[in-house]
Amino acid sequence: MAEKKKCLATVKSQSELAPGIYSLWLAFPEEYNVAAMAKPGQFLSLYSDDGSRLLPRPISICEIDAAKRMIRLVYRVAGAGTLEFSGKQEGDTIAVVGPLGNGFTPRSGKSILIGGGIGIPPMLALAKSLSGEVQVVLGYRDAVQFLKEDLAPYASVYVSTED
């Protein structure tokens, strides 16, 4: 396996999907196309600009567009590092290492994917990669839902909430 190196990704877009939940599209340089190496279920380590936070933040990959050298991350603001990322705008850069992790091994045939809360985003890349019938069960705390519409073209979607 090739050694992963740190590179600078450029923010292409960022939006708030739900309170505290952000969608971030990153573009990668042609000479180190992280998107071409990524597969569903992997994650990226994002580094803060602030030297006081030495450890990177692991964020799962939501969507992969290898042809455009882009990856979409959907994350929850949970501390100072992710709060910093939520303020990034188009054209800003973020230091990234990845893709990391083993990822999923897609198989043909019927698939049932189950995810809740911030565990939902990696299900989108997986659902898009599967052949055959796909059903997705999503769990949310309340009626504020994210990524349901994104998953609908690729799977039958079922939702459960705590409220």
Residue map of PLM features:
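Ferredoxin-reductase
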Residues: 2-90
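FNR/FR-type flavoprotein reductase catalytic core
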Residues: 80-163
